[in-house]
Swiss-Prot record:
E.C. number(s) listed in UniProt: 2.7.1.23
Any Pfam family hit: NAD_kinase
Keywords annotated in UniProt: ATP-binding, Cytoplasm, Kinase, NAD, NADP, Nucleotide-binding, Transferase
EC main group: transferase
Residues involved in NAD(+) binding: D66, G67, N139, D140, D168, T179, A180, Y181, N182, I183, S184, Q234
Keyword Aminoacyl-tRNA synthetase: no
PANTHER family: NAD KINASE
Highest taxon in the source lineage: Bacteria
Protein name: NAD kinase
Main function: Involved in the regulation of the intracellular balance of NAD and NADP, and is a key enzyme in the biosynthesis of NADP. Catalyzes specifically the phosphorylation on 2'-hydroxyl of the adenosine moiety of NAD to yield NADP.
Family the entry assigns: Belongs to the NAD kinase family.
Record GO biological process: NAD metabolic process; NADP biosynthetic process
Length: 276
């Protein structure tokens, strides 16, 4: 895909990580790489990113695991800056490379030898009296029961009842999020370039409920009982506080920096033992 980084003009790179973890050596290592190119490495405050500050940066680095990357995506999507995920955590499925690969990657990077891949986010629109609140999730929006009663999730499309789900809940996953909670609940693996989203029931009290794949442009209304809404597992929304909830794919896209030879199917094999 078309690159949106001018290598010759890079001046500042933002680094997002959990500062309470022992990553000082990794941070110093990255800073040394960029100093050789007269590039400043700017540490970003994890709890709250200032969008104005992001506008001065050429791209962003997430140093940590998938949770760190998700947190950056949800906070920085409005800045429209490319993101590079460097794994310093456990699984690191979403991150582009391990920390041990960083030095060799940046040698190629500064030769313009990399690629940009784009992915759409989920948009959650909440209505409360005269207010409209928009929230975004990169992986998934999950309705999960909040007590001993079964979750009741009714889904409407164009004001018609689409389906009703009874059980532990319902996962609404983006294509990128298909390999997260969705796959654990029996949902399909979806290539991240696909502009679709998936509805996967969790422990459905039915023998006939199956996951379904829906296209970009569909917007669903959800009416729920006995459950909470979790966005990327990092933010909790109580549906009872809102009059109406709509979910679909957003027009907003995130741009990710990857190695030029990255093979998605090889990542599936290495990280999830796919096909083995």
């Amino acid at each position: 895909m078309k690159k949106c980084i001018n290598i010759e003009k890079i001046q500042k790179i933002g680094l997002f990580c959990r500062l309470n973890t022992n990553l000082n050596k990794q941070i110093d290592f990255l800073r040394a790489i960029f100093l050789q190119k007269n590039i400043e490495l700017v540490l970003l405050e994890q709890e709250k990113i200032n969008l104005k500050d992001l506008q001065e940066l050429d791209f962003l680095i997430s140093l940590g695991g998938d949770g760190t990357l998700l947190s950056l995506c949800r906070q920085a999507y409005q800045a429209k800056k490319p993101i590079l995920g460097i794994n310093a955590g456990n699984l690191g499925f979403l991150t582009a490379l391990s920390f041990n690969e960083a030095e060799s990657f940046f040698k190629d990077f500064f030769k313009n030898d990399f690629k940009i891949e784009k992915a759409k986010m989920l948009q959650i629109t909440l209505y409360k009296k005269n207010k409209i609140i928009k929230k975004f999730a990169f992986n998934d929006a999950v309705f999960s029961r909040d007590n001993a009663l079964m979750a009741n999730v009714e889904v409407f499309f164009e004001n018609k009842l689409f389906n009703a789900y009874y059980g532990d809940g319902l996962i609404i996953a983006s294509s990128s999020g298909s390999t997260a909670y969705n796959i654990s609940a029996g949902g399909p693996i979806v290539h991240p370039w696909s502009e679709i989203f998936v509805l996967t029931p969790v422990c459905s009290h039915s023998l006939t409920q199956r996951p379904i794949v829906l296209p970009y442009g569909f917007e669903l209304e959800l009416k729920v009982e006995h459950c909470l809404l979790y966005l990327d597992g990092q933010e909790v929304v109580d549906p009872k506080e809102y009059d109406k909830i709509l979910i679909g794919l957003s027009k907003k896209e995130l741009s990710f920096i990857h190695k030029k030879n990255r093979d998605y199917f090889q990542v599936l094999k290495e990280k999830l033992n796919w096909g083995k």
